[in-house]
Amino acid sequence: MQEQYRPEEIESKVQLHWDEKRTFEVTEDESKEKYYCLSMLPYPSGRLHMGHVRNYTIGDVIARYQRMLGKNVLQPIGWDAFGLPAEGAAVKNNTAPAPWTYDNIAYMKNQLKMLGFGYDWSRELATCTPEYYRWEQKFFTELYKKGLVYKKTSAVNWCPNDQTVLANEQVIDGCCWRCDTKVERKEIPQWFIKITAYADELLNDLDKLDHWPDTVKTMQRNWIGRSEGVEITFNVNDYDNTLTVYTTRPDTFMGCSYLAVAAGHPLAQKAAENNPELAAFIDECRNTKVAEAEMATMEKKGVDTGFKAVHPLTGEEIPVWAANFVLMEYGTGAVMAVPGHDQRDYEFASKYGLNIKPVILAADGSEPDLSQQALTEKGVLFNSGEFNGLDHEAAFNAIADKLTAMGVGERKVNYRLRDWGVSRQRYWGAPIPMVTLEDGTVMPTPDDQLPVILPEDVVMDGITSPIKADPEWAKTTVNGMPALRETDTFDTFMESSWYYARYTCPEYKEGMLDSKAANYWLPVDIYIGGIEHAIMHLLYFRFFHKLMRDAGMVNSDEPAKQLLCQGMVLADAFYYVGENGERNWVSPVDAIVERDEKGRIVKAKDAAGHELVYTGMSKMSKSKNNGIDPQVMVERYGADTVRLFMMFASPADMTLEWQESGVEGANRFLKRVWKLVYEHTAKGDVAALNVDALTEDQKALRRDVHKTIAKVTDDIGRRQTFNTAIAAIMELMNKLAKAPTDSEQDRALMQEALLAVIRMLNPFTPHICFTLWQELKGEGDIDNAPWPVADEKAMVEDSTLVVVQVNGKVRAKITVPVDATEEQVRERAGQEHLVAKYLDGVTVRKVIYVPGKLLNLVVG
């Protein structure tokens, strides 16, 4: 073998071997235990970033480890290829989204191969191909027939100048990102899938997911937002309809002093006919899109509609206000307000001088002080007529029962979760397979017209979707009648909700899934991706699995047994202030830094001499220009070094700080491994190891080898603390580097140790391990080698360390056989120079001996 470690030479050779041998291609095999290891599929943006590299390295380490345990391991990869960025890039580069996307896929595929990930490339799929989305379209038509799909109008961002719908991220400060026109809210018909029909199951089955992070399960629980409460109907004077509200706090009902409705509510619209102030307010609300997250912090505004509702229990008239914090799409679009016991209602009532009536006593039984804020804690009722003196639960039930008996209340379970709106008014997505006949009938596209193919050879003007701009595209005939196709496309979360199942049978032509293959591989054993997908993707992913189960395609309830959310990758960030006060972010690669004695950055400048402000470590991002290109790092150090650093620098689920000094450290370690194998093999063949003829030192070294195997196995397999596994291997390597290699048995022991080290490192650094395994004459390819097993006998300690004290002060530490008697330990202690010195000429009055641990000689 060559003396120097040259990753640029070995890595491409090993990758070619894997390609030619199709090493990682698998098929169903009932005789073997399966393991399905899946990383979230990437969006083909053009280049891999470090976040991808971290995600996929973790997946590859787990997959390779499980393979070495003898399992049938599926690790597939594909491309989440539809989506808005492709449209923007196509307009910018004067091309169409399809060629841009396919070019990116080709480029990124090479990058993935360059990193040595062991994927089954025969299963690669791109979600923008008709071969893939045809089954999604077919499935949608089936869901429609089952009554799980419906159409209703829903508000979107509308640019009146471009006459087009904008995604939320295309609205900048209330204006269109392209033409700066003020964006309006417009109601348009859209398609929805009834995820709410599965709300209870999605909620309850979270309890089955023992190996999902609690944070993710909590986020999903809150997102589904199940609550138990009462729906209450109010009569409204001089208004044709009643108003219905939902509350989870009927115990506070006697303190309800006003109602609030959404600006889009029919009652507000009616009142606005004769109220210009209200009309202007409704207009303002219509054009400010409020994300639910912003609701809490925004200023609460409202206008009195002039209508009065009648409190069903007290008969009092209470005002009805239109307010910007009530959303039409949530609940009934109307809420009851109890300002004494809800902080938002309190702030609104204080601002507009509305009545604040306390009905719950403070914890000490006194009337609450509402001069500064509402009392939101539950407690005992007062000021509530017949319900005075009841605690929260009793009051909840008594008031709910009374309202029900009167016919104006109904107990209800409510969900925050809304049905999934899957319509997008974009081009680069899968066409929604619905048609409208000449007579207005809406129906699914017939099977013989599926897939509805998205034309790829299009011209993008950046304004209107090409399939909306071309009236001919939509024309078709159904049942002999002219019909128009739907020109909206699916939300791209549709494609990523079932791709994991299609990987099990990517070539299957008879339907969406081949149940036999799907049920062999599913559920996924471990799913790896970012926590930012906790609610949207991971909820739709679970929902789709249940839909496919109910269609008879899969027989499990949940798609993935374990979820691992990897931490973000951080890097140093620097900027200088430009002439106009703007921040110009400078890549850490271009920053020349000075550090203090602790290695902290104290000064920085760039090549042009700008003084740089160092803002610390932050997530690698385009906006801060602090991304590090993985390709540059692989070209500089090799893929194995980058992979090793990624797994060593931090626990998988914590943030990782990118430090090139750490990358250099990982590289030095691999050079040491190479050097040790080189020096070992240069001495020729090795005799067989005779474990019964080892010296004490050899036994001790062999014990370290097998203890390391046991620790690394536990760290990777059970604990998934990959960084501590690598640390243990590094510690063993330090011992091996110092071990004698003079005798035949020394070299035989070194051979056993190196074969173990190379196999333990293989999941992390597969190229160097593949090569060194061959140099060590390991059996077959390392890709088919079994994981090393710790020898229990070798790990048994036959000696132990005893601390020797004289009058309670430590004077020596001695190694004695495990079965040594107290006499033998005393005799051995007496041979130590320091112990002998303190025993000279004195009498030992007392001996305290803790077997195998401590010998304390009390002298006087």
UniProtKB/Swiss-Prot annotation:
Residues in the signal sequence: none
Record carries keyword tRNA-binding: no
Keyword Protein biosynthesis (UniProt): yes
GO cellular component, one term: cytosol
A GO molecular function held by the record: ATP binding
InterPro entries for the chain: aa-tRNA-synth_I_CS, aa-tRNA-synth_Ia, Leu-tRNA-ligase, Leu_tRNA-synth_edit, M/V/L/I-tRNA-synth_anticd-bd, Methionyl/Leucyl_tRNA_Synth, Rossmann-like_a/b/a_fold, tRNAsynth_Ia_anticodon-bd
Bilayer-spanning residue ranges: none
Chain sites annotated for binding ATP: 622
EC number: 6.1.1.4
CDD domains: Anticodon_Ia_Leu_BEm, LeuRS_core
Renumbered ranges of motif 'KMSKS' region: 619-623
Subcellular locations according to the entry: Cytoplasm
GO biological process: leucyl-tRNA aminoacylation
Catalytic activity: tRNA(Leu) + L-leucine + ATP = L-leucyl-tRNA(Leu) + AMP + diphosphate
Main location: cytoplasm
Pfam families linked: Anticodon_1, tRNA-synt_1, tRNA-synt_1_2, tRNA-synt_1g
The entry's keywords: Aminoacyl-tRNA synthetase, ATP-binding, Cytoplasm, Ligase, Nucleotide-binding, Protein biosynthesis
Motif interval(s): 'HIGH' region: 42-52
Protein family according to the UniProt entry: Belongs to the class-I aminoacyl-tRNA synthetase family.
Protein's recorded name: Leucine--tRNA ligase
Gene: leuS
